[in-house]
Amino acid sequence: TAIEAPVDAPVSVEAGRGPGREIDYGAPGDNDYERLARDTCDVRAMSTADLAEIVRIDRGLTGHDRSAYIGRKLTEAMTESGVRVSLAARLDGAVVGFVMARADLGDFGRTDPTAVLDTIGVDREYEHQGIGHALLSQLFLNLAALRIDRVETVVAPRDLALLGFLYDVGFEPSQRIAFVRALK
C-alpha cells in the first residue's frame, strides 16, 4: 500500500511592478535600513574653504579655540601630505562634520601602512544622525583603496562618548601604551 504524503498548499507571492511583474527587492523604498552609512550626507575631500566651519564645529565640541591647530592640520593635509585623506561632511548646504587623518608608512622602526586619525567632529545639531559613521565609512573605504592596513588614534580615557563611538565603528584598544613625562 502506498502512503500519501501531505501536499503543501500552493505558495503565492504578490505580483511586483518590475518587468515580468517580479518584485524588485532593490527598490530604494524597500530597503532603507540597508543604506550605506556614507549615503546619509555628502562626504567629500576636505578643502581650505571648509576651515571656518570646521573651527566652528570643533569649538562647539571642545569649548576651546583650536583654530591654529586645525589650520595647521588642514594646511598639512592640503600641501604637505602626498595623499589627502581628510574629509568633510555636508548636509543642508553646510559642513556638519569632519575627520582629519593622515597616511603613514611607519613609525618607531615599523614599516607597515597605517593611517592616523588626528581629530573627528560632528556639529552638535547633527549628532546621532549617522554623520560620524558616514565620515569613517568613507575614510575606511578610501584608506583600503590605498592599501592601508590599520587606523590608529589616541583618546582620553574619560571621553566616554568618543570611546563608545570608536568601539561602535570597530576600533579596539591597541597593545601599545602611550607614556608621557612632564619637563619642568
Question: What annotation goes with each model-predicted range?
Answer:
Residues 3-49, 184:
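Conserved N-terminal entry element of GNAT/NAT acetyltransferase domains
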Residues 36-41, 45-49, 56-112, 118, ...:
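Acetyl-CoA-dependent GNAT
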Residues 102, 107-108, 133, 140, ...:
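General detector of folded, globular domains
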Residues 104-106, 125, 158, 184:
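Short coil/turn motifs at secondary-structure junctions
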Residues 122, 128-141, 168:
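Conserved acetyl-CoA-binding loop-helix of GNAT-fold acetyltransferases
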Residues 127, 153-163, 180:
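Conserved beta-strand-loop-alpha-helix junction that forms the acyl-donor binding cleft
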Residues 133, 145, 157-175:
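Conserved active-site alpha-helix within GNAT-family acetyltransferase domains
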Residues 143-155:
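Conserved GNAT acetyl-CoA-binding A-motif
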